[in-house]
Structures are given as C-alpha cells and as structure tokens.
Curated annotation (Swiss-Prot):
InterPro entries: Beta-prop_RSE1/DDB1/CPSF1_1st, Cleavage/polyA-sp_fac_asu_C, RSE1/DDB1/CFT1/CPSF1, WD40/YVTN_repeat-like_dom_sf. GO terms for biological process: mRNA processing; termination of RNA polymerase II transcription. This is Protein CFT1. Belongs to the CFT1 family. It comes from Candida glabrata (strain ATCC 2001 / BCRC 20586 / JCM 3761 / NBRC 0622 / NRRL Y-65 / CBS 138). Signal peptide: none annotated. RNA-binding component of the cleavage and polyadenylation factor (CPF) complex, which plays a key role in polyadenylation-dependent pre-mRNA 3'-end formation and cooperates with cleavage factors including the CFIA complex and NAB4/CFIB. Involved in poly(A) site recognition. May be involved in coupling transcription termination and mRNA 3'-end formation. The gene is CFT1. Residues 479-493 have a biased composition (Polar residues).
Length: 1361
C-alpha cells in the first residue's frame, strides 16, 4: 500500500514542434518533457514565455501539428492546427484548443496496439514511430513491420467513392426533415476530422519488405508517397562478410480510397534499390529527394529512386559502396548514430534548387549538408561543420529534438530550438549561415555521368527514359578527394558566420546518483543571526555527462540572501516608508502592548521622537499617499493624516475596530469588524484631509470580510465608453461573508459586479453584474484575495485566493476575454498549504497568514505569505507560478525594502533584510534547483557519477569518469596485432574521486586512478574499528573495476578512505581536509557495489558478495560470503538485512548474522527482473522491496513468511507493478515526516526517493490501510468521473504491463498526481465525493493529503508548522 508522487517534474526535452495551436497571433513552440506539454511564445529578442502547460497521465512518444482544413483563420490567412500526440505502445490522440474555456479538448482517440499484435508475429517495440505527410493529410504510426495510416478529412474530393458521396447527401436530406438538434448533428458529421484508419503489414507493400529501419513520407509527389528503408535479411557486423550490402530502399506511392466504414489503398512501387550498406538507418526527406543517414556515410537519392552520390564521413566508411560518385569527407571523423536529429531549412522562393539540411551529432556539433540541383541533376553535395565557437553548445550533448522557429533567407539568419538529453535546451540563432558553408566548384559533378547506374539500380524492363538517370562517373567507384577543389567563401553575405545562444530551458537530466546533505544550511549563523535555512537538508545529485556534467541541489525551500540583520525588543508588524526616492522611516508596532515606534533608517535606526505619530496604539497600516507627500496611519479606531515630518493634519474616528486596510493613492479602503467598509479619497488641492467616497447602496445589505483597491481591465467590457479597451481601471474590490468577490468603480452609479463561481471555487470564473441573492448565509472561507501580475520579464495577471484554512488557490486571467479567469485543473499542481473545515489547524495557528504583494523582488513580481511556514509565490518566464516555502523560520510580518529587497520579522523579534538568491538557482520546477559546476576550463572532470555526503565533516565526495582513447593491449602490455593508432579509436575510461567543500564548492583533494578504471560505487558508512568498545568511525568505501578487452579478464579493487583535518593552504581556509587511505585490496573480478552493514562493509566481487571487517590495525579480513547468480547491479542494507538486485535474476533478500558470521538467504523473487535499482520499503514493521527494471517498471515485493504459498518467505510476494514514464537510475531511503504523529507503538516511518534519466525525481510513500482505502476511492472517482487530457486512462498508463497478473489487482500503487486533483475540484464536487466515504471523511481525507504532501519535510527538521 504505497503512493507515488513527483518531487521534480521531468526536465529533458524529448520532442518539440512549431506552429499555431492556441492562437494565430504569433508562432508557438510546443515542447514535450516526457508527460508534460508546454506551449511557449518565442520572442525575437531570444526569450521563451510560457503560455500554457498541461500534464498528461502517460508518456508522450511524439508530437505533430495537423493543419485544420477550414475557413477558421483570424484574418491573417493562418489557420489553427490540431495537435496529434503519440502515446503508449501504439496510440494517437487528436487534440484541439478551446479558446472559450482556455482548455484542450480531445477530438478523437485511436488505439492500434491490439491490431498491431494480431497483424505481426514479432514482439512490438515499446514505442511506435510517428510520421506526418508533408501536406498534413495523413499520419502514419509504425512499429516494427506493421503500420497504421490515419487519413485526415480535407473535404469531399471528386475521386472519392460515389457511394460515399451519395450516402452523405442522403444523410443531409434526411436530417433536414428532423429536429434542430439532429440537423446540427448531421452538420457535425460532415465536418468530421478523420477517416477510418487502415492497418498495413509491411509485406503488403512489397514481398521482400520486412525488418523496417525507417519509413518517411516523401516530398514532391502529387499523391502520398513513402520511402521505406529495410533489410530483407537481418544483418550485423558479424555476418558482414556474407552479406556486405544488406539494406534496400523502396519508393512506394499510396492511393488511398475512403468509405464510411473503412479505408483501402492501392500501391505502386516507383523504384527499389538494393545492396546498400547495413549502417544506413534514417531517411531525411528533402524537396528534391531524400538523404539517407548512416553511421559512416550520407547518401542522396532523387525522387525517381536513383542513388546519385555518397559522402563518406569518417575513416570507417564502408569500403564496399555502391557504384556511384563517392565524395571523401572522412576528415570530419563524425558518426551519425541511429536517432541522430536533422532539420530541413526552408528554401528561398527564388532558389528552390538549393537546399540545406542541418545534422546534429551526439557531441552537440552541427553540420550543414547543402544540395544544389539542376532539374534532376545534383550539382552540389557537400557537408560542412559549423564553427559554433568554444562556448556555444559546449556543455550539451545528445540532441533529442530540433525545431526551426524562424528562417529568414533574406538576412540568412535562422533561429532553432534544440533539446538535449544532457544539457539545457537551447534557442540558438545562426547568423549568416552561408558564410560558413564550404562552396564547391559549381560544375564539379556535371562531368561525371555514371552510365551503369540505371542498369545496377533499376529493373531490366524499365523504359528507355531511365537512361536519363545515369548521372555519374564511368568508374565503378570513383573516390574523389575534393579537399583541393573546395573554397571557403560566402554565398550570399559578406558577414562572418556567428552562433548565439539566446535562451536556455533548465535540464538536470539524466540523474546519475544522489544523496542528501547540507547545502543552504552549511553556515549556522548569517549576519549574526541564525541561518534562515537552519538545519535544512537538500537532495544533491550528479547530472549529465561529458562537459555538461554538474551537480544539482534540490533545495527544501527558497534560500534568500541576508543583506542585513536587526534585533527588536517589541514588534509584531513592520512597515518601511519610502520617501523622496529612498527608505526614510521604519515603523513598527506591537499589538500585545498597543504601541508603535518610528526609526530613522539613515541614522543607524535610531528612534525618531519628533512629530505626532500615534505611538500609544496598535498600527494596522501606514503608508505614503498624495504623490509621496503625505503619510496615512490607520490604528485600531482612527485614521490619521500627516505630512512628511509627521505633523498631523486630520483625524477620523471609527466606532468599530479596523480589521483590514488597503491604500492606493489617493484612496484608502478600510474594513471594520462590523462587516462594513469605508472608502476615503485624499483631497486633491491641499492634500490636508480625506473626503468620503459614496458607496453603492446595495453594500449596506452585505457583510464584508476584507477589501482591496486594484487596477485591472477585467470589467472594461461592462463599463460604458471603454468597451474593448485594455486600459486598466481602478476598482474597489471586496470579499463578502458568503464568499463572493464584488467590484465597483468610483463612478459606479450604484452598479457593482461580481465574480461568478468563486464561492464554490469553480474551474472557470466570469464577471457579471451583481444581483443580491434571496438569502445570504454567512460562512466565510475566503480570507484574502489579490489580483496582480506575477513574473519576471513576462508578467501575467492572476487571481490569488487565501482561505482561513491556509489554502492557496490561483486563477489566470483569460487571454481572449479579460472578464474571465480559469484554473488549469490538469496542471495546477501547487503544493497543499492548508485545509478547510479546520482539518489542519497547526498551519494557521500562532502566526496569522497574510499575503503581501511585492512588485519588485530582485526583478520578480511575487507574493509572500507570512506564517509558521512562510511561502513565496513566484513565476519564471518559462514556467507556471510556483509556491515554495521561504526559509525554515517563521515570518510574522514583512515590508518592501530598497530596490528589490524585503524586510521580514521572525517569531523571536529578529529582522532580516532579504534579497533573492539567483546564483544559478532555477525557480521554475516544484522545488528550487541550484546548479553547481565542478571544475573549470583548465580542469574538466567530465562525467560526474557517484556522490556521497560525509556527515562528520559536512563534505561531499564525487567520483568522475573521463573518456580516453582506447589502446588495444594484451595482458603483457603490448599492442595487439592489427591495432591502428592513426584511426579514431574506441573510448576507454579513466576515473577518480573528488573531495568537495560545499562552502565554496571547490575541489580540495583529488584521487586519480589509472587508465581503464571505473568507479562503480562509493558509499559513506560508519565502520566499527574497535571490537571491545564498539567504537565506530565514518569511512568512505570505493569500489573500482578495470576492463581492457574481451580476452583479458576484468579485475577490480576496493579502497577505504578517511577524511582527516589538516592545516589549510595559505589564503584558502576551506582546504582544511584531505583524503587518507586506510586500506586497499586488489580483487579478481570487478567490484560493482559496496555498502555498509552492522558496523562492517560488504562488496560485490565477480559473482560473490563478501562481508569484511576492519581491525584495529586498519587491516581488513573477510568474515562471510554469498554466491549470486549473474551480476549485482544494486545492493541496499537496512540494519542487518540486505536486498540484492541481479542484472538478470531478480532480487534476493538476505540476512547477516555476526555471531557466528554468516549470510542467510531469506527469500528471492520468482520473476526474473533485469534489476537496475532496488531499495527497502518499510511500512509499519512489514518489509517491502522497491525494484526498478530495464523496462521502466517499478515493482513492489513483500517478505511475508506467514502467508501461504510463500514457503515460509522464501518466495517474495509480488504486490504491484507500476509503469514509470522514464528509466530509473537510482533510489534512496529517507525518513518520512509524520505531520500527524501516530502512537509511539508504531515504528519510525520511511519513504523512498527515485531519480530518472529524464531529470525527474519522485517519492514512494507507504501508507496505512485506512488511508489507502480513502485515497484509492478518490483516485477511482477522479479516473472514472473526471475528463482526462488526451483521453489517456491513468489506470491503464500506470498498470498495463506484463506483470499485471502477478500483483494484487485491488492493491495497486496509487498515483498522487491524480489524487491531488481532488484539492482543485469545486467545493460541491469535493463534497459529493467525500460523502460517499462516510461521516467525518472530509477531515480524514484532507489530513491524508497533507501528510503525503509534507512527507519530505523531514528535510526541514526544525519546521514548526
């Protein structure tokens, strides 16, 4: 009984596409990160502004835009497009954006998996490949040797079936005689989007077509035509001598025919070419033909199927190539592996014969392939590496997606978006591209006409016209080294080529390893006061590989910069008066003693004793007004007006206590405890008194809880003379006791407006004229509202609601209609901060929660929320608004300070001036992420692997791996016969260990290992060093493997290190620790994993697990061992228990006993998982195991010796299997925070953290039986009753795998991403669900949600909330 939740959303961009999906006003960039769909607005200046974001319930495999064939353009000749998503094994979802509801609607769903399985005997691949016809008329989904074609409706054509046309006409005639509803239905049927799909086995395309490597729709044909790259007989390097050229290529025309019930097709093979190299893997269509990408070569075939030329790319190019023109470009030494990305640059309208294709290799280098043709004759074929510069894309590798955003052929500039598996996604601008292209002599290919090409690659019965295809040299294999006949020049511009990175989207994937340790709480005191992030623990992980590898710290809360610290004796609230361009006075009040004080900021905060400020009363609010020439003070019963020297001008007394004040020059809005309001305007001429503003008469019938003065254009369409104007108007805004929000202007004429749906927290809200209900039932839940703009460079307007229970809700103003607000239920994943019905009184007791809007907090417009756990609401340009805990100490009151800072008061009357820490910290994910680069340009450690935190010294140890050139040596060290050092060699590894001080993140000590070494694992463990006293010391254990070649057996070794304190280097106080080697031992076989257990340590060496003991003289002796089946990939310990994950044989559960020394196998899994990582799951004294395998499936197994059919626990019980959307790399056990502590009889709670290659981090939290039942019911209700984005079934996406039948169908792992949608439902919908759970279930459900939400507060041990 476990619950899965995301801690960090995926960050690796897997797919992207440009087009018009939500608007035609500007081009949109749609970005996919595993299961997150983001829609950005690109700006020419180089920014990406997030406009929409949605989270799906399944992994998105591919994305495409399908143009709408309708008259729905917005006057600029551009139509919106449908969005086509490929998910699962073989599923397509067609989506449309609804501007009225600001939501995505599902038009149609297409499931092909069952049809694919019945149409082929091969096992289906996990993901199908999506291809789109150039005109957007067809979508193709293929998996191995079976494909599905989905035709899109483009209107009835003349060549369609006559029956189909007549059938539609008869339907229209029949519908004209029926009701209006049915007439509309008939009209909808005529405007349908898709025709029936057709499933095709590859053998239907041609008798030899099988083992498909790639399929693409081709350009330049009147009918839909595909190119198929396939191998009639599977080949690999082992049988290359028998089948040297095993690959074929076919061009096939498809003639689709439609009927109501089915789609059929006729095929015509235009051309078929055989005997192509085995490493050719990808088809890149161009306007005049196709590029065939291979690992070692690139070939060009025209649209008639003639192979015209081949470029060799490296020294390993196939020596047996087809008999065509071969151009030697092997000096590039580049390899385009399967999955290499390419992008076709749009051609100039005046130069259709010139084409440029950008190719991206795995190292982040960009190559340009330029094609020039005259008719069908290829006259230019060349490849050039673009000189990007040292800093451009230097820390990025393995491109995962490429989209061209803008292409300006006139200026020869191109803006492209590139997503990387390792490194931040980048918007890259290429200026004067043609200046970097190597220009061949324009007639270099005209003299080469291969008269044998037609006979070799065309059928014998071809027409005589095929002789025109013989284009190249008489030589069978004319190798031409064109290094001497190429020139570096400019084609269209005299300006030099430059590349510029405009903006990056933060990526922390792939995550290699992680640990927990101190980052923001290294210093105990800051500026003489306790660190605001005191005792916080962060998740620190190693990310990326190669030059882009770095550390990432996942912070538990925002870590502010402390600029200054102050101490007060008596204070509960604070204000800062900004006068004449600077901070002049600091005003404090103490509500417990009913007194106020004023301090001069310029005079070292000395008390200001002049003037008539009311000091013997509690100040509710104080601010400047009247163009900063007057000061207004509101106490519990009075309003005072002063000049800048606190000379009093006027006083207004109130009969009831003031509870809330809002000031916006020249107005003051006051809410009284009786429930009525007062609005005053500063007299404009002399500014010495307030004038009362007349209020609408209907307000006398209402009970007001709070008020706000704001400026917005949301009521403009209801105001006469304004209409569609976007000019913001001043609005007096109120919250009533029946949870309505009302507005009126100064010139209201007794007309007020309301925000409909806010009382029930509906998904969408709209403004209308207010009408007094027949009965008002006071039941206030909304405490405070704000309507303001949030963001950094791009600011959007949001409605933010704070309830009396501490909940925070947020709505965004509609882009299409300013009088509407909407909430993105599918993506509104704000953390739970409170609960209704007093379900979480701890969150709001003691310190009042109040929202404070800060328009400039180091450039960000943010909202602070005071309380025991303070929060900050902020928004990055490329993300949604996020809610983060702000530090780890309470905040009682706060105010603006200077330019971009705030001053905050904690619960012990200390004041700190904060600014935002922007030192490589990203605030656009669920938690703040700090990027930490290790090393420098002079010392590049390449890939960072394992990371360990040393608790005693508070230092980090990181292993690194560098790629070195491989040397094929025998056991005696001599080079093997046949080794060619002049050719590019394979890569070997060289590893080491770094000791890092987190105060400066500098490497203070380093351990270098020999060549061909690899640090497989590293752990910090407390090892017993004295058997008599049982004294333990924290040691570092490092497991190493050495591998050279397949004929030499691998070896390994393990090292034990201590960290000792030394005298620091001069001027470097942080270098006061060094690594000290305690023990080292060589091992036969590699050491794959290490860990500590019961004061000893164990290692996996070859096919054994060996437990060793450290003696007093620092020697090490083995004390116990265990044989393992194949290879240990993961091993974890808990007390004296061990769980071992094998690469092929599942897991083993083992116990270790020290008296006598022995290892006892307690149980093992029946299923043979290919284990990647394993971890303990401890729940209420029961032992569970979390296993992740190579199929990205997470399994939960249980040790249950009391259950039948387990052979006293020898068979581990398979509880559930849960599909991950990405491959897991590592897991870690952490203590769980119990927000509602249970009885002391229960053992301590734990949770497991997992990290994936897509940059996501998740947690698996065990729960009690009663909690599981409540949450399971809520999840079922949401899945069954609520609409799912893209029509994906969350239950199917998570549980549909080959292990489903092994688990308990009624005890699956729950998905908290689904359950948490409960908090974003409307209040009546929530009530409807919890009523089915029984009495008082609402209270229990909210406590369950809060306990799961706050489980990671174990990283904040002193949190008082």
């Amino acid at each position: 009984m476990n619950v899965y939740d995301d801690v960090i959303d995926p960050t690796v961009v897997s797919h992207s596409v440009c087009g018009h999906f939500t608007t035609t006003d500007y081009l949109e960039l749609i970005v996919i990160r595993t299961d997150v769909l983001s829609i950005y607005k690109p700006i020419r200046s180089g920014r990406l502004y997030l406009m929409e974001e949605h989270k799906l319930s399944g992994r998105i495999n591919d994305v495409a835009l399908i143009p709408k064939h309708s008259n729905g353009s917005n006057g600029n000749g551009i139509n919106l497009s449908y969005l086509l998503l490929s998910t699962g094994v073989a599923k397509l979802s067609l989506l449309m954006y609804n501007n009225m509801t600001s939501s995505i609607e599902t038009i149609s769903l297409h499931f092909y998996e069952d049809k694919f399985e019945s149409a082929t005997m091969l096992d289906l691949a996990r993901n199908s490949q999506l291809r789109i016809e150039p005109n957007g008329n067809y979508a193709m989904l293929f998996n191995n040797d079976v494909l599905a074609i989905l035709p899109f409706y483009t209107g009835i054509n003349e060549d369609e079936d006559e029956d189909y046309i007549n059938n539609d006409k008869s339907k229209i005639n029949d519908n004209s005689k029926k009701s209006l509803f049915k007439r509309k239905k008939g009209k909808t049927q005529n405007n349908k989007v898709t025709h029936p799909s057709i499933i095709i086995n590859c053998s239907e395309l041609g008798p030899q077509i099988k083992n498909i490597k790639d399929i693409q729709f081709l350009c330049g044909f009147t009918k839909s035509t595909i190119g198929v790259l396939y191998q009639p007989q599977l080949a690999w390097c082992g049988n290359s001598q028998l089948v040297p050229l095993p690959t074929n290529y076919a061009i096939i025309s498809l003639d689709m025919k439609f009927s109501i019930d089915a789609t059929t097709f006729d095929k015509a093979i235009i051309s078929e070419i055989s005997q192509l190299p085995s490493d050719w893997h990808t088809i890149a269509p161009t306007l005049s033909g196709s590029l065939i990408l291979g690992v070692n070569e690139i070939a060009f075939l025209d649209n008639t199927g003639v192979l015209q030329s081949i470029l060799t790319l490296n020294s390993y190019s196939d020596k047996v190539l087809p008999k065509v023109r071969v151009i030697d470009k092997s000096s590039h030494e580049v390899f385009f592996n399967t999955g290499s990305k390419f992008a076709l640059i749009p051609s100039n309208e005046n130069e259709r014969s010139v084409e440029n294709i950008l190719l991206f290799d795995e190292n982040g280098c960009i190559f340009n392939v330029d094609l020039k043709s005259e008719g069908r004759l290829l006259t230019q074929f060349n490849i050039t590496k673009l000189p990007l510069g040292e800093d451009v894309l230097s820390q990025k590798s393995n491109p995962s997606s490429v989209s061209i955003i803008w292409a300006d052929g006139r200026l020869d500039t191109y803006t492209i978006f590139i997503g990387f598996q390792s490194g931040d996604a980048t918007m890259l601008k290429l200026n004067h591209l043609h200046s970097a292209i190597e220009v061949e002599e324009p007639t270099f290919m005209k003299d080469y006409v291969n008269k044998q090409a037609s006979a070799a690659y065309n059928n014998e019965d071809d027409d005589d016209d095929d002789d025109d295809f013989n284009l190249y040299s008489d030589e069978e294999n004319d190798q031409v080294n064109n290094k001497n006949d190429r020139t570096f020049g400019t084609n269209e511009s005299n300006e030099p080529f430059t590349a510029q990175e405009l903006m990056e989207l933060r990526n922390i994937g792939p995550i290699n390893s992680m640990c927990v340790g101190k980052v923001s709480s290294i210093e105990d005191n800051v500026k003489g006061l306790p660190n605001p992030n005191k005792q916080e623990i962060s998740i620190v992980c190693t990310s990326g590989y190669g030059d882009g590898s770095h550390l990432n710290a996942i912070l538990a809360s925002v870590q502010p910069r402390v600029e200054k610290a102050l101490k007060f004796i008596s204070i509960t609230k604070i204000w800062n008066l900004h006068i004449k361009g600077k901070d002049k006075f600091l005003i404090t009040t103490d509500s417990t003693q009913s007194q106020s004080n004023i301090y001069e900021i310029d005079n070292n905060f000395s008390q200001h004793k002049q003037g008539r400020l009311r000091r013997d009363a509690t100040t509710i609010h104080i601010a400047t007004i009247g163009d900063n020439k007057r000061i207004v003070q509101v106490t519990t019963n009075h309003l005072y007006l002063y000049d800048l020297t606190f000379r009093r001008f006027s006083t207004i007394k109130f009969d009831y206590e003031v509870v809330h004040v809002s000031v916006m020059d020249p107005y003051v809005l006051i809410t009284l405890s009786r429930g009525d309001i007062k609005v005053f305007e500063l007299e404009n001429r002399n500014k010495k008194k307030f004038v009362k503003v007349p209020l609408p008469e209907i307000l006398t019938e209402m009970v007001i809880t709070s008020g706000l003065i704001l400026k917005s254009n949301m009521c403009n369409e209801f105001l006469s003379g304004i209409g569609k104007s976007t000019i913001e108007q001043l609005l007096f805004t109120f919250v009533t006791a029946d949870n309505q929000i009302i507005f009126f202007t100064k010139d209201h004429n007794d007309r007020i407006f309301q925000l409909n749906g806010i009382d029930q927290l509906q998904d969408s809200l709209y403004i209308s004229t207010y009408q007094l209900p027949d009965e008002i039932i006071p039941d206030p839940s909304i405490k405070q509202i704000m309507i303001n703009k949030l963001g950094n460079n791009s600011k959007d307007e949001y409605l933010t609601i704070l309830t009396f229970g501490g909940e925070i809700y947020q709505y965004k103003k509609s882009r299409s209609r300013h009088s509407r607000f909407y909430r993105n239920v599918g993506r509104n994943d704000h953390p739970i901060t409170g609960a209704p019905d007093n379900a979480y009184p701890k969150g709001v007791s003691g310190i009042e929660r109040i929202m404070h809007y800060i328009p400039n907090f180091d450039g960000y417009s943010v909202i602070f929320v005071t309380g025991n756990t303070p929060y900050i609401i902020m928004k990055e340009d490329d993300s949604l608004p996020r809610i983060f805990p702000f530090g780890n100490i309470p905040i009682v009151s706060m105010s603006r300070w200077g330019e971009g800072s705030v001053i905050c008061i904690d619960d012990i009357k200390n004041a700190r001036i904060y600014s935002l820490n922007q030192d490589n910290i990203y605030y656009g994910n669920k938690l703040p992420i700090r990027k930490i680069k290790i090393g420098s340009m002079l010392q590049n450690y390449k890939t960072l692997n394992s990371i360990v935190y040393h608790e005693r010294t508070q230092l980090y140890l990181v292993s690194y791996t560098k790629e070195i050139s491989y040397e094929a040596k025998a056991e005696d060290g001599s080079l093997l016969i046949g080794y060619k050092p002049e050719l590019p060699n394979a890569k070997a590894f060289k590893s080491g260990v770094l000791l890092i001080n987190p105060k400066s993140w500098e490497v203070i000590d380093e351990l270098d290992l020999p060549d061909n070494s690899l640090v497989n694992d590293m752990k910090s463990s407390f090892i017993q060093i004295d058997t008599r006293t049982k004294r333990k010391r924290e040691y570092i254990i490092v497991g190493i493997g050495y591998a050279t070649m397949e004929d030499v057996p691998p070896t390994g070794e393990f090292h034990i290190y201590d960290i000792t304190e030394v005298v620091p280097e001069p001027g470097k106080p942080n270098t006061n620790f060094k690594l000290k080697e305690i023990f080292k031992e060589d091992i036969r076989g590699i050491v794959s994993v290490v860990n500590g257990i019961s004061g000893r340590f164990l290692i996996s060496q070859s096919q054994k697990i060996m437990v060793r003991d450290v003696q007093q003289d620092n020697s090490v002796i083995p004390v116990a061992f265990l044989d393992v089946p194949v290879f240990v990939t993961s091993l974890k310990t808990f007390g004296n228990l061990i769980v071992i994950g094998d690469a092929m044989q599942g897991i083993q559960f083992v116990g270790f006993d020290a008296e006598p020394y022995r290892m006892i196998t307690l149980g093992s899994s029946i299923t043979k998982f290919e284990v990647i990582s394993v971890e303990f799951l401890v729940n209420n004294g029961d032992i569970y195991f979390l296993v992740t395998d190579r199929d990205s499936i997470m399994h939960v197994l249980k040790y249950a010796p009391d259950q039948p059919n387990t052979l006293s626990g020898q068979r581990l019980v398979h509880c559930s299997s849960f599909n991950l959307h990405s491959l897991n790399n590592c897991t870690m056990l952490l203590p769980k925070n119990d927000e509602f502590p249970r009885d002391q009889r229960y053992s301590r709670s734990f949770q497991t953290i997992t990290a994936q290659v897509d940059g996501s981090i998740s947690k698996i939290v065990p729960v009690k039986e009663e909690t599981y039942r409540r949450l399971y019911f809520i999840q079922q209700q949401i899945i069954d009753k609520e609409p799912q984005l893209a029509g994906l079934n969350p239950r199917m996406e998570r549980q549909d795998n080959k292990y489903y039948h092994l688990g308990h169908s009624l005890r699956p792992m729950l998905d908290f991403n689904i359950i948490k949608r409960f908090k974003d439902m409307s209040m009546n919908r929530r009530s409807h669900i919890v009523q089915k759970l029984g009495k008082n279930s609402n209270l229990e459900v909210w406590r369950d949600l809060i306990d799961l939400e706050f489980s990671l507060r174990s990283l904040k041990p002193t949190d008082q909330n």
